[in-house]
Amino acid sequence: MAVVTMRELLDAGVHFGHQTRRWNPKMRRFIFTERNGIYIIDLQQTLTYIDQAFEFVKETVAHGGTVLFVGTKKQAQEAVQVEADRVGMPYVNHRWLGGMLTNFQTVSKRLNRMKELQAMDAAENGYEGRTKREVLMLTRERTKLERVLGGIAEMTRVPSALWIIDTNKEHIAVAEAHKLNIPVVAILDTNCDPDVVDFPVPGNDDAIRSTALLSRVISTAVEEGKKAREERQLAAAKDAAGDAKPEAEEAPAAAEAEEAPAAEAEEAPAAE
């Protein structure tokens, strides 16, 4: 079964690129035609690249990897959060903090601070002994941290791959990923640079329906990867149990074999 159909791509407007005056010549090979001053993306190629991106994400997750969903532009914020939450993956949908990948140790400290403030807020007497002004300042700090870091609260290490909507806007995230050799999977609109992406998905990165559909494809790949990982773990557990069973059966048999000669010796009549 196809990951996504041509009809779904058309209905979501994935084929609409930018105005012809706003384009990156490197994207020429992904463009089908021009219509009314707008570039039309070749969806046949999009389908092929979607399959490649899907398999990569699926295998990455199947081998224990994580995928960080990134999209801070208004059209992408909801899709990024919804799809990442759906499959238990981290996300950034408000602001990319410089060093979020390359200086993850410092970011981890901010995550710990956020959790500390959340615990304080949840406790019955968490703010006991503090003035109203102090409580207000702590609340503001917690809210700010949750807005920026809430999506990566459970991220304990840098991700295995990034899913990015609008590589131009998220150029810092792309640069950090490259510095750490983290593969980038991204939507490539006609104004993007395909050279900075490892697994491109040619398409519209401005329409809400387009970003939602393509993010759904990636989250489904994550879902499939998790299933594959669980199946591998179950198979490994069964194999381990199967190897242990013959050993357990051999032990009593060996003991019986050792006891038999001794019993025969006891039963034999004494020589006169």
From Swiss-Prot:
Keywords attached to this entry: Ribonucleoprotein, Ribosomal protein
Region (Disordered): 224-272
Entry GO MF terms: structural constituent of ribosome
Top-level taxon of origin: Bacteria
One Pfam family from the record: Ribosomal_S2
Gene Ontology cellular-component terms listed: cytosolic small ribosomal subunit
Any one Gene Ontology BP term: translation
Regions of compositional bias (Basic and acidic residues) in chain numbering: 224-233
Biased composition regions of type Acidic residues, renumbered to the chain: 256-272
InterPro entries tied to this protein: Ribosomal_uS2 (IPR001865), Ribosomal_uS2_bac/mit/plastid (IPR005706), Ribosomal_uS2_CS (IPR018130), Ribosomal_uS2_flav_dom_sf (IPR023591)
Family: Belongs to the universal ribosomal protein uS2 family.
Name used for this protein in its record: Small ribosomal subunit protein uS2
Taxonomic source organism: Corynebacterium glutamicum (strain ATCC 13032 / DSM 20300 / JCM 1318 / BCRC 11384 / CCUG 27702 / LMG 3730 / NBRC 12168 / NCIMB 10025 / NRRL B-2784 / 534)
The encoding gene: rpsB
